[in-house]
């Protein structure tokens, strides 16, 4: 089975064409391929499928390194767009895809970057899903080591965002692991640690559900900016610096879609036995 290795700001992917070849996946196979010493090594596996909706171009599926399937990955979406173009699966500049929880438009820019319409942020707790009686801009979450104030949003996947004074000293791995599996997140969550530099610039580290801390998390950057705007901390255009590089996020507020722009790089092509 043919695949490509790609990355978006160091968030790396095994990308498989399920349009022109038969694909057989199991959690065990995905975990085997994800092993960085004995396999391909990746944060997520991305699967390109024929469209479920005749008005769209493709269906987009995402699997974490632990084999679990998730409904969104922003960095992956940019790599998805670059992949289907490189492989000649489409010649469109604007590519319509469906995911497990919605639709997206992926736009190839003249400068080589990819702009993604991520849709509207979702704030209703039941739709995130998050256990709360009503939407609030800030929630209190208690763990064994720390009580935190955070914002919660879905970008097609659940995000919990907390503000920190210094991104370098933030307790990302220990606190992230506890919050990822907090009882109020029935489907677990991605945990963002956000340092606000000014109203147009943040630094961010993300502990991703099923993957741990990654070099970059596109949907996490979107979630952090959406929360920051809702909390009155940020303006509508924000530069997000992640360990792996920079993303640019735009959101005009409630009722508007959120846009993410960034790089997507092809590393190599390979083949595995399935």
From Swiss-Prot:
Q: Which GO terms describe its molecular function?
A: diaminopimelate epimerase activity
Record-annotated active site: 73, 217
Please provide the Gene Ontology terms (biological process) for this protein. lysine biosynthetic process via diaminopimelate
DNA repair in keyword set? no
Identify the pathway. Amino-acid biosynthesis; L-lysine biosynthesis via DAP pathway; DL-2,6-diaminopimelate from LL-2,6-diaminopimelate: step 1/1
Q: Where is this site: Important for dimerization?
A: 268
Q: Which Gene3D superfamilies match?
A: Diaminopimelate Epimerase, Chain A, domain 1 (3.10.310.10)
Q: What class of enzyme is it?
A: isomerase
Q: Where in the cell is it found?
A: Cytoplasm
A GO CC term attached to the entry: cytosol
Q: How does it assemble?
A: Homodimer.
Q: What does this protein do?
A: Catalyzes the stereoinversion of LL-2,6-diaminopimelate (L,L-DAP) to meso-diaminopimelate (meso-DAP), a precursor of L-lysine and an essential component of the bacterial peptidoglycan.
Q: Matching HAMAP family, A to Z?
A: DAP_epimerase
Instruction: Name the NCBIfam families for this protein.
Output: DapF
Query: Under what name is this protein listed?
Result: Diaminopimelate epimerase
